[in-house]
Amino acid sequence: MSDTKVYRASTTAPVNIAVVKYWGKRDAKLNLPTNSSLSVTLSQDDLRTLTTASCSSTFTDGDSLTLNGESSDISGARTQACFRELRSRRAALEQADSSLPKLSSYPLKIVSENNFPTAAGLASSAAGFAALVQAIAFLYELPDSPSDLSLIARQGSGSACRSLFGGYVAWRMGEKEDGSDSKADLVAPASHWPEMRALILVASAAKKGVSSTSGMQQTVATSGLFKERITNVVPANMALMEEAIKDKDFPKFAEVTMRESNSFHATCADTYPPIFYMNDISRAAIRAVECINEKVGRTVAAYTFDAGPNCVIYYEEKDADIIVGAFYQALQGVGGFKEGAASARSSIEFDATLASTLKEGVSRVISTGVGEGPVKTDEFLA
């Protein structure tokens, strides 16, 4: 009798925001990076991708992927690499145990939803590919560890490998040509430093002009600064950042985070022709963070920017009133602040020009903090 059952599994996966940046591939096909990187996984209460993976012999249209209600192309090499790798691991289980249903031979139907704007510099591809890989791994009942699964997610989107873990996560660049040692590992769980918070200023929810993939390869090919960055700057920053996290040393964490962001965007500007992901609002956000730190007399906030204009500001819970209060005051009427922000009292006031640049350019804020890795859920998307 043929198996007509529909098998399914769902997971949520988080966004991660790098504090030591990934920029540049040494192998574009396998998504192998030119340097290691390190990120903070953000709470799924605020930013998450929900993905349901199902398979059945009755799915006659072949594999499919629906993202935010729209059919998405799955013919790309990256998605295909993830499917192929996961199927082969399931097939190995089926070969070892003939009583298992032959799920590896059934078409896959993936349905995914983000609760944040896609492709606007909010690391949506990282959460998306991490969720896709984890959902299929749950569906196939694979015994692989998050680090093993990160090898697969990496082939979909480099930074996705870091979204297989919660907390503070390193992506080790590895040295092997086949990429078998280029994977994520846990630097520290969220519970090690749970006080870490992030305020995201969404400067533009529009799709970015130069995609990360093409941008980074232009940098590799044309930037003179790039070699210095991958040879000296990043290895030093990785060591300092791991130390800062281990010691819960926020001033050190903050300085490395800001210097790293500056270094990354300097190599983008040094690309020929230059790439500019940041805009006037981004630069105003930097001035705002500098203003806060200067007026407080210690480093209480750190800015970082990925390949887009959105500013992510890291701070510790104990300084929430200072940071949230200052931005709440400047961004009156902008949505996304959490309950209690209105009562946050900050002694910091930005000058009128800075405040009005921020108010005009920031479309919303997202208030969040460090969080956990993918979570299996009983919430299913059709």
UniProtKB/Swiss-Prot annotation:
Pathway the protein takes part in: Isoprenoid biosynthesis; isopentenyl diphosphate biosynthesis via mevalonate pathway; isopentenyl diphosphate from (R)-mevalonate: step 3/3
Induction: Expression is regulated by the Zn(2)-C6 fungal-type transcription factor FgSR which binds directly to the promoter.
Database matches in InterPro entries: GHMP_kinase_C_sf (IPR036554), Mev_decarb (IPR005935), Mev_diP_decarb (IPR029765), MVD-like_N (IPR053859), Mvd1_C (IPR041431), Ribosomal_Su5_D2-typ_SF (IPR020568), Ribsml_uS5_D2-typ_fold_subgr (IPR014721)
Pfam families reported in the protein's UniProt record: MDD_C, MVD-like_N
One GO-annotated biological process of the protein: isopentenyl diphosphate biosynthetic process, mevalonate pathway
EC number: 4.1.1.33
One MF annotation (Gene Ontology) recorded for this entry: diphosphomevalonate decarboxylase activity
Keyword Nucleotide-binding: yes
Gene3D superfamilies xref list: 3.30.230.10, GHMP kinase, C-terminal domain
Cellular component, GO annotation: cytosol
Keyword Secreted: no
The protein's enzyme class: lyase
Keywords recorded for this protein, A-Z: ATP-binding, Lipid biosynthesis, Lipid metabolism, Lyase, Nucleotide-binding, Steroid biosynthesis, Steroid metabolism, Sterol biosynthesis, Sterol metabolism
Catalytic activity field: (R)-5-diphosphomevalonate + ATP = isopentenyl diphosphate + ADP + phosphate + CO2
Highest rank taxon of the organism: Eukaryota
Binding of (R)-5-diphosphomevalonate, residues: Y22, W23, G24, K25, R78, S157, G158, S159, A160, C161, R162, T213
Family: Belongs to the diphosphomevalonate decarboxylase family.
Described purpose of this protein according to its UniProt entry: Diphosphomevalonate decarboxylase; part of the second module of ergosterol biosynthesis pathway that includes the middle steps of the pathway. MVD1 converts diphosphomevalonate into isopentenyl diphosphate. The second module is carried out in the vacuole and involves the formation of farnesyl diphosphate, which is also an important intermediate in the biosynthesis of ubiquinone, dolichol, heme and prenylated proteins. Activity by the mevalonate kinase ERG12 (FG05912) first converts mevalonate into 5-phosphomevalonate.
Subunit structure, as described in the record: Homodimer.
Protein name: Diphosphomevalonate decarboxylase ERG19
Species per Swiss-Prot/TrEMBL record: Gibberella zeae (strain ATCC MYA-4620 / CBS 123657 / FGSC 9075 / NRRL 31084 / PH-1)
Gene (UniProt): ERG19
